[in-house]
Amino acid sequence: MALVKAKPTSPGRRFVVTVRNKELHAGAPYEPLVEKKTRKGGRNNTGRITTRHRGGGHKQRYRVIDFRRDKDGVPGQVERLEYDPNRSANIALVLYRDGERRYIIAPRGVSAGTEIVSGVDAPIKPGNALPLRNIPVGTQVHCVELRPGKGAQLARSAGANAQLVAREGRYATVRLRSGEMRQVLAECKATVGEVGNSEHALRSLGKAGAKRHKGIRPTVRGVAMNPVDHPHGGGEGRTSGGRHPVSPWGVPTKGHKTRSNKRTDKFIVRRRKR
């Protein structure tokens, strides 16, 4: 895996930096694990925009990922690594001994031919999934569940990891990349190691069109809008907005806390760093 800087043969190529991974499968995905994906353009069922800056982009198909890792005790072998347009991490196609194939998030250090397994007796090596109560304290993990059997929810993107820092009674404490320390039920599963493709953060799309290919539309500044559209809008000539930065709905955007889920506050041991 290497970063490749494009030659400036045109203005659109001048700033392009891509990640080249020769281990990735060049062909089509495994068809039984591919589903149709309908684009919503950021709209909900009433047709109103609920997520801004979405729309257009290349047609994509969804790869069904095994986030539960519930095939306990059945060894599997990684057949190949693949690109997934739906996430920053790469995915691995695993062939299990009973003949079933599943996609998993590709951990760092896992390649074609690597043996993986899940379950309480799984060895502590990258790619193996087991409950937090069976993982040694200090181990780096990813794809961490928040509820047993629900499937991985934490540390799933490229280069992500969490560290198991303590275990007491029914709960284990994990430290996330954000600095947040959180208690999770020790029965929840996690995968050993960190997510691969960490170079994803270093790439540069190089031009606006590449963003559009991904289905991301432009972000318009509030000061460039009219007063009816944004609190920073309007004024004669160019203005600074005239107030502290806020969202289109008047919520402060710099340093203002917006977390409102009080029900799970008790599980957060330490807040994330600002």
UniProtKB/Swiss-Prot annotation:
Chain positions covered by the region annotation Disordered: 38-59, 223-274
UniProt-listed InterPro entries: NA-bd_OB-fold (IPR012340), Rib_uL2_dom2 (IPR014722), Ribosomal_uL2 (IPR002171), Ribosomal_uL2_bac/org-type (IPR005880), Ribosomal_uL2_C (IPR022669), Ribosomal_uL2_CS (IPR022671), Ribosomal_uL2_dom3 (IPR014726), Ribosomal_uL2_RNA-bd_dom (IPR022666)
Record GO biological process: cytoplasmic translation
Keyword hit for RNA-binding: yes
Cellular component terms (Gene Ontology): large ribosomal subunit
GO-annotated molecular function: rRNA binding; structural constituent of ribosome; transferase activity
Entries under PROSITE patterns matching the protein: RIBOSOMAL_L2
Origin: domain of life: Bacteria
UniProt keyword Nucleotidyltransferase, yes or no: no
Ranges of Basic residues composition bias in the record: 50-59
Keywords: Ribonucleoprotein, Ribosomal protein, RNA-binding, rRNA-binding
HAMAP family, alphabetized: Ribosomal_uL2_B (MF_01320_B)
Family label: Belongs to the universal ribosomal protein uL2 family.
Subunit: Part of the 50S ribosomal subunit. Forms a bridge to the 30S subunit in the 70S ribosome.
Function per UniProt: One of the primary rRNA binding proteins. Required for association of the 30S and 50S subunits to form the 70S ribosome, for tRNA binding and peptide bond formation. It has been suggested to have peptidyltransferase activity; this is somewhat controversial. Makes several contacts with the 16S rRNA in the 70S ribosome.
The protein's name in its UniProt record: Large ribosomal subunit protein uL2
